[in-house]
A protein has these predicted regions:
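Juxtamembrane helix-loop-helix connectors linking adjacent transmembrane helices
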Residues: 91-105, 127-193, 211
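Short cysteine-rich clusters marking metal-coordination/redox-active sites
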Residues: 21-24, 35-38
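Hydrophobic alpha-helical transmembrane segments
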Residues: 67-68, 108, 143-147, 183, ...
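Structural signal for the C-terminal ends of transmembrane alpha-helices
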Residues: 120-130, 249-253
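Alpha-helical transmembrane segments in multi-pass membrane proteins
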Residues: 65-126
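Functionally important transmembrane alpha-helices
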Residues: 78-83, 219-223, 229, 235-275
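Short Cys/His-rich micro-motifs in 6-15 aa windows
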Residues: 39-50
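Membrane-interface helix/loop boundary segments of multi-pass membrane proteins
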Residues: 197-221, 249-256
């Protein structure tokens, strides 16, 4: 990464110096603002050849700071939500219609707060560099694998939560929430998470993290962030981290956020109907 060697690129080699892009490692001009190979934003280093291309560029730093600020608010909101849920739902008392209405009201309030925070960041914060565009073959493979991968995740969900219910006897609030499926449940459990959570975790956060770390690290860090956004579903966090990573890889492979949005919505809908 510290190699600022002049690379021969043809007739213009004498006038054009290149250095490895911080993201993909391929040669990029020292004068370029965007990597021609992976679209990473680059920091001009013509004034100081000892610096690396696109090291800690101000725009990237602004996007990362906005992402961290947003998550720093989303996480406490989730923790407060979990604590209120813990004290407002008595496991010894039957989950009646009044309790269901109260819990769903709380969920919708929290989701409204989360939506305002995330949409505010998307509208007003700096944008991270876009993820590298996958090849047509990779995109086709991602769409082709959408249903098989989703089926595998649903099987993993059933197995994981069977262990929690039957072997570990862990009470799951989602069992009560999905006992009756109506428009309220579909909006709260399927629509809002599939749109808002994907916009933050698989779009903004994932691209921000790719500004400062490798692709695989960005995938798993964003997946952990996604998992802990669901503190109210504490026993499910390990599974949510796995599904978050799968959604992230599918977004990168397909080149579009639509794939994880579809997968997230269908996954939650099927799980809710099974409940």
């Amino acid at each position: 990464m510290n190699d600022n060697t002049i690379h021969e690129t043809g007739p213009t080699a004498a006038s054009e110096e290149t250095a490895p892009c911080w993201r993909c490692g391929l040669a990029a001009s020292l004068e370029a603002n965007v990597c021609p190979h992976c679209s990473a934003r680059l920091r001009s280093i013509a004034a100081d050849p000892d610096q690396l291309v696109a090291g800690a560029h101000r725009h990237a730093s602004g996007a990362v700071k906005a992402m961290l600020w947003a998550y720093g608010v989303l996480l406490p909101v989730g923790i407060i939500h979990a604590l209120v849920m813990q004290f407002s739902v008595d496991a010894e008392v039957p989950f009646n219609e009044a309790t269901r209405t109260r819990v769903y009201t709380q969920i919708l309030i929290v989701e409204g707060i989360d939506s305002l925070i995330i949409l505010g960041v998307l509208l007003f914060a700096p944008r991270p560099a876009p993820a590298p565009i996958p090849t047509p073959r990779t995109r086709i493979a991602a769409w082709t694998l959408l249903l098989p991968v989703l089926g595998g995740l649903l099987a993993l969900n059933v197995g994981y939560h069977w262990v929690l219910r039957q072997l570990l006897r862990v009470p799951l609030i989602t069992d009560e929430l999905t006992a009756q499926i109506d428009i309220l449940a579909i909006v709260a459990l399927c629509v809002q998470p599939a749109v808002i959570e994907e916009l933050f975790c698989r779009f903004y956060a994932l691209d921000c993290l790719q500004e400062i770390t490798s692709r695989h690290a960005a995938v798993w860090i964003s997946a952990v962030m996604f998992g802990f956004m669901h503190v109210a579903m504490l026993p499910s966090i390990p599974y949510l981290i796995v599904i978050g990573a799968v959604f992230a890889y599918m977004r990168l492979a397909s080149g579009t956020l639509l794939v994880p949005v579809i997968m997230h919505f269908v996954h939650n809908l099927v799980v809710s109907l099974m409940g």
